Structures are given as structure tokens and as C-alpha cells.
């Protein structure tokens, strides 16, 4: 049993949505600090199995120290590589449920060295996997003003994106932009403070999404899930902003909607294009959870099952 640390968002709803079979095989695509993983394991029998992914080596190390369970397999990898990994394990079409929590974990936000937070000072990194790729500092240095503005707008809908990008480049003429509070202060001079929202929220979100290619990875794993899941297997995704949720919503709608066929055509059953999924709806965060955990206020859980 793990020490209580990370507060898993929409825990009860996600456990219900997975419709867990005691002897089933499940995937937690984003282990984090293991709150959801522990919940799944608690509902499995000795024959059940959980495969947990995380690209953050700190999460894997935490799991190895705090969650020793022979039903659990830990994979240090981005979930976008799920299909190839599950294929190698001989489990294609045998997974009874996939849970994807797209949020940044509390330890990641609270660890200044990770560079995710605009509230504590630290190196401007923002990589989920710090062993690979370009940090936020490196990208902001190499990108031009237009590229920065486009990323900030595309991944957060920040209306002041061009003004922010201009201020970033002006700052870099005389300074090395390398800490979180430096960036937060630049943005705060451009964006007005809103109730319950820091001025730099959208900018940090956009740069983090870009650095980690989060939307590209999400689109990839959603498509992969159609092959990975067993018949009636559940797909449950918790998103935290409208851009993510729109991708999930459209994917489920596209794959659960039967195409309209012209009347009178001589088509036999096996020629009709089948739908992959059944849309099981969405869940919103309860007021009680929001009161207890402000970070949960924007969470949406969407659920589908494989036909």
C-alpha cells in the first residue's frame, strides 16, 4: 500500500467507468503517483493484471519503492508507444480497460526543478521525460517570435499570445530566460489577473503541451485503443482543458456514429462499415471534490466501450 500523497482526480467516477472485472487486464496510461493504479489493483483478484505507463522516471522509481505487487507491470514509456508494447506482450485485443489521466501530477507541479509551475521558481524545463528532448528554455531561445505566438495561441487560445511572444523576445535581448518565475513575470505584465486563475496559466499550459507533444500523443493512443481493447473493453479519459476534451469527444463521436447508407442499395452485412465504439457519456467533477481539490475543477471524464 502506498503512502497517500497524490490526490487522484475523479477517482470514484473513473473506477465506476472502467467497470472492472476482477480477473481482467487493465492499463493505467499515466501512473503518476499511483492513486488510480492502486484503486484498480484493489478491485482485481489474484488473477487480474495491471499494466502502468509513465514517461516520468520519477514516477516509475516512486512506484518501485511504494507499490510492490506481482499483478503490476510498470512501463517507463510515453503512452503513445502503447500499441507496440502491448503487441510484444501478446495482449492485443485482450485489454479490458484503459484509463488515461491527462493531468500534471501534484508532485510534478510542486517540484520546482521540473519547471511546470508559475508559482515557484525553478529551471524552465517542462519535460515530462527529462532524459530526452528540448527543454522550454532551449525552445524559447531557438524559436522566433511568430513560432512562440502560434504555439501559445494554438495550445491555449491565449488572446494575448502575440504580445506575450514579443515581450519574451525583447527580454531575451538582454537576459537568458531560464527560470519559471522569469517567464511568469513577463506574462503577468501582459495578461490581466483573473479570479482563481494566474495570468501565466494558459501560456505555461501551451508551452508544456508543445514541449511534450501532448496532443499528438493523445491522438495516437486514442487510435491505438481500438486495436488494444477487448470486446466491451472500456476507454476512460480524464481531460483538463477544452482542447484535450474536444479531441477526445470528436474521436468517440467519429468512431461511435453509424454511417448513413443510401436506401435500396444491395449491401450485405459484412460490407457495412462497423462502428468501433459505443459512447457511454461524460462525467463532470462533483462540487464536493472541487471544494477539496481546486485542480479538479476543469476535469471531464469521457467513457466509451469497444463494440
From Swiss-Prot:
Binding site for S-adenosyl-L-methionine: 34-36, 54, 79, 101, 108
Record function comment: Specifically methylates the N4 position of cytidine in position 1402 (C1402) of 16S rRNA.
EC number: 2.1.1.199
Catalysed reactions listed for this entry: cytidine(1402) in 16S rRNA + S-adenosyl-L-methionine = N(4)-methylcytidine(1402) in 16S rRNA + S-adenosyl-L-homocysteine + H(+)
Assigned keywords, A-Z: Cytoplasm, Methyltransferase, rRNA processing, S-adenosyl-L-methionine, Transferase
Family named by the database record: Belongs to the methyltransferase superfamily. RsmH family.
Species: Vesicomyosocius okutanii subsp. Calyptogena okutanii (strain HA)
Protein's name in the database: Ribosomal RNA small subunit methyltransferase H
Pfam families cross-referenced by the UniProt entry: Methyltransf_5
Compartments reported by the entry: Cytoplasm
